[in-house]
């Protein structure tokens, strides 16, 4: 299985307590090589202000969000391994993990898995798409040794 090239950018005011680069690498490697070989992904971990600004600019939503995915569209005739960028908001991940009673590490893993599937073209706008994407997320999270991230919704 090929490995994903990771460009990790830590852009928080305080970067202490974040997952290690090796963890981000493990989470990416659990998703992307199943679908695409020789991939490069940038993960940028940001604070609330940057997440809010990007979410407003690119999605028209005037609030921060947990993860944003920016797939790279390769121009016709070019071959590139760049899959895209994930922007993950530290404070949103921490807040959601606490509110949902999930281990913080598991929620970080879920955000990387979720965002990576978006980079690969998966979405959750329509119900059938959401079911397919959530099933994949659950399968990958279980393979990584974490609980089903949607268990609370299924109970």
From Swiss-Prot:
EC number(s): the record gives 3.1.-.-
Compartmental location: Cytoplasm
Q: Show the InterPro entries listed in the entry.
A: MetalPrtase_cat_dom_sf_prd, YbeY, YbeY_CS
Cofactor annotation remark:
Binds 1 zinc ion.
Q: Which GO terms describe its biological process?
A: rRNA processing
List UniProt keywords, sorted A-Z.
Cytoplasm, Endonuclease, Hydrolase, Metal-binding, Nuclease, Ribosome biogenesis, rRNA processing, Zinc
Any Pfam family from its record, for instance, is YbeY
One cellular component term from this protein's GO annotations in UniProt: cytoplasm
Q: Where does Zn(2+) bind?
A: 114, 118, 124
The main enzyme category here is hydrolase
Cofactor(s) the protein requires to work: Zn(2+)
Q: Which GO terms describe its molecular function?
A: metalloendopeptidase activity; RNA endonuclease activity; zinc ion binding
Source organism superkingdom: Bacteria
Function per UniProt: Single strand-specific metallo-endoribonuclease involved in late-stage 70S ribosome quality control and in maturation of the 3' terminus of the 16S rRNA.
Please report which protein family the annotation says this sequence is part of: Belongs to the endoribonuclease YbeY family.
The molecule here is called Endoribonuclease YbeY
């Amino acid at each position: 299985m090929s490995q994903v090239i990771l460009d990790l950018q830590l852009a928080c005011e305080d970067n202490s307590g974040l997952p290690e680069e090796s963890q981000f690498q493990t989470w990416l490697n659990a998703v992307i090589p199943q679908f695409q070989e020789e991939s490069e992904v940038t993960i940028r971990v940001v604070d609330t202000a940057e997440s809010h600004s990007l979410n407003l600019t690119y999605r028209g939503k005037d609030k921060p969000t947990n993860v944003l995915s920016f797939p790279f569209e390769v121009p016709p005739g070019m071959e590139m391994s760049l899959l895209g960028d994930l922007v993950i908001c530290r404070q949103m991940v921490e807040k959601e993990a606490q509110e949902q009673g999930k281990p913080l590490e598991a929620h970080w893993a879920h955000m990387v898995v979720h965002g990576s599937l978006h980079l690969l073209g998966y979405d959750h706008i329509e119900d059938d798409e959401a079911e397919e994407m959530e099933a994949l997320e659950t399968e990958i999270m279980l393979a990584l040794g974490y609980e089903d991230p949607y268990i609370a919704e299924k109970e």
